[in-house]
Amino acid sequence: MKKLLTSLMLSTASFMLLLTVSNKAYAYEETETFTFEIYNMNSVVANPGLYNYLVDLTDGYGYGQMQHVTVDISLLDYNTAYLEKNLNGFNLFFTSDTGVYEFGIDASGNIELLNDPVAHDEYSLTFTGLNNAYQDLFYEEIVVEFEIVSFDSLEGVGTLDPNPYVVLSELLTENYEYNETIAPFIWVNDVQYQNYYSVYDIGSDLALIEIDGPTLNIYSDRFEEYNETFDVGDEFRIIFKIYKTWTQAHDYGRIRTNASTLYLNQQSDTSALLSHSESTNVINVNNIAVGDEIVMQSPYTDFSVSYGNVGFPRTYLVEQENIAAVKMIKNSSDNTNYTFILFYWENGSVVSRTVNNINLANRNSLNIKFDGGFRKALNYSDVMVANVDLLTPLEDFLPNMVAWDAIDGDISDSIVITDNDGYSPDTVGIYNVEFSVTNSNGQTSSIIAPVHVVDIVNPVINGVSDTVHISYDQTFNVTNWVNSLTVSDNYYTGLSISIKENTYTVNKNKLGTYKITVQAVDPSGNIGTLTRTIVVNDGIGPVFNGINTITASINENITVEQIKAGLAAIDAIDGNVTTSIVVDSDNLTGKANTVGVYEVVFRAVDAAGNQTFHTVTVSIVASPPGFYILNSNSVRLLPGANLTIEQILNILNASDAENISTNYTVSVPGTYNLSFTLYGESHQVSITVLGQNDSIIPTPVIPGESNPGFNITYALIIGLSAIALLATTVTILNKKRK
């Protein structure tokens, strides 16, 4: 054999498992190289671990071409390479422009170059494939076995038992659910034969055999290269290796097993192993032999395995997020020892964890629960949302789509939009857009995904929003303010404004800071708000109680402090603020012995700084000593002032009074009433004869406080609104009564 390559060739190919979790695909694979040398013209001895490695690599299941294993070999210039598993070991095929090189690997690790060997050529084999503990479950190998029970001729017709026609015809029909069927392989009496159309259920010039109902048609001339003859009793084994895409794969999870008592897609009275559209599988653990393995795999991130009996609570063996697969191995016949190998996602990779010595004794069932429901080969990762303001084209969502095919691998770049459902990026709504992808075999998968065109911008409320400062005795008109506002929106029109919160109205007479918030809500649920702050403050000054006018004799020498003592200041918020009263202006002091009219202005202030001014008019008259006239309607006589009614009327400027009535007693302390008519108007006057300890000017009564020394005499202003002295300075008249 001519040496074409002298250096080691490492395979750069890899097989991607048909399994995606959260938009990721993974190839849980390993690579190993074996070197050997041909010592003679027909056989060599390989690395002893090669056979066991290949068994682990293919996980020991099924026969036929191992499509999920890639092979590379030095010294050969070849186009394709593939690995087959047969009944006794493995075959390696390398096709080139000059022919096919075939190696055989038996269970002892021997490698035999079956054609064109050259002694002392050194070869290296590099295998890349699935790890021994983890296997792609999204393909199947279906074995059909039958025996010839009669045969008419070497070229002709035989009959079969059992009749495999139904199974084979279904497998070879285009409408069958399987996505890709690798050409079947035929074993006759444990000898393998291969032809692209090895088996057919209709006429074909290439078929080795035809199955027509129970009839077997054998084309011996097509077996000539194998020097095969056939007869009654010959045993046939036909193996189909079938790949599935997600759209045609089982809806939930898949299960593989080498347990002879458990069959894929079948259910018996004693055990069930379902790998079609069922979310729950129940396995009778008593029907599993020691050494049997069951591998459970799901295209979803989660599923659970539990065990239990009737009457016993279910106990979970496996319940973990991001589980990709579980492998179970039975180690003891009494069910006391099982091994579970968990494969799960961690930091973007699949890792494994082994749990040993799981005891399933006294438990009659293993319950496998696949969660999540059916998911197609074509999938999308997130809710697809477009902002109506950005005018997003549908093509921008293609990176959100993921498509995987059993043969082609990642075909996400081939996804196209097949129906846009009238998608309009400037119109809010939900559009059910159809996306499709077609693999290299011409098969198409589709998915309808909702694309949401949304408005995410809040309305804007326009208007005055500065802080309002208002006194508690005033009212801010909320309605007028709301009516003055306008609203604008990026998409909708005709939005209304409503009050969302109003803490002011119910507290408008209480000092404090309050807020009024209005809102506008558009049909997309976006909310725009505007808040105005209302500060209710104290804008009202105190109210003075007490005297307004005083008439006094020049002999009394009245002082400002005496007048101040007759005043009080009450604030609606702060209450009694009398202590805040001060003299603001004074033209009386120093003139109390001089006849004239003077004014003293007092000022009171509350805690808010509001000021109130109060003027007391003081008239100094040249009359008999011993009296004061307060507010024109209260005469206060000092001890020893023995004035008569006539004198009192004179100092009241009412000497012309008529209809005089009084209970006044001269020099006797007490309070008396005086009534009279002056120029047709009635008047009431209080006369107080003071005792030695009485105040000259009474202290005003403070609401809520007791003041027995005053008797509210100054309140008798009621009914005296017309007296001439009320608004003018009091002077003494000497006009005689008519």
Curated annotation (Swiss-Prot):
<keyword id="KW-1133">Transmembrane helix</keyword>
<dbReference type="InterPro" id="IPR013783">
    <property type="entry name" value="Ig-like_fold"/>
</dbReference>
<protein>
    <recommendedName>
        <fullName>Uncharacterized 81.3 kDa protein</fullName>
    </recommendedName>
</protein>
<feature type="signal peptide">
    <location>
        <begin position="1"/>
        <end position="27"/>
    </location>
</feature>
<keyword id="KW-0732">Signal</keyword>
<feature type="transmembrane region" description="Helical">
    <location>
        <begin position="612"/>
        <end position="632"/>
    </location>
</feature>
<feature type="transmembrane region" description="Helical">
    <location>
        <begin position="712"/>
        <end position="732"/>
    </location>
</feature>
<dbReference type="GO" id="GO:0016020">
    <property type="term" value="C:membrane"/>
</dbReference>
<keyword id="KW-0812">Transmembrane</keyword>
<keyword id="KW-0472">Membrane</keyword>
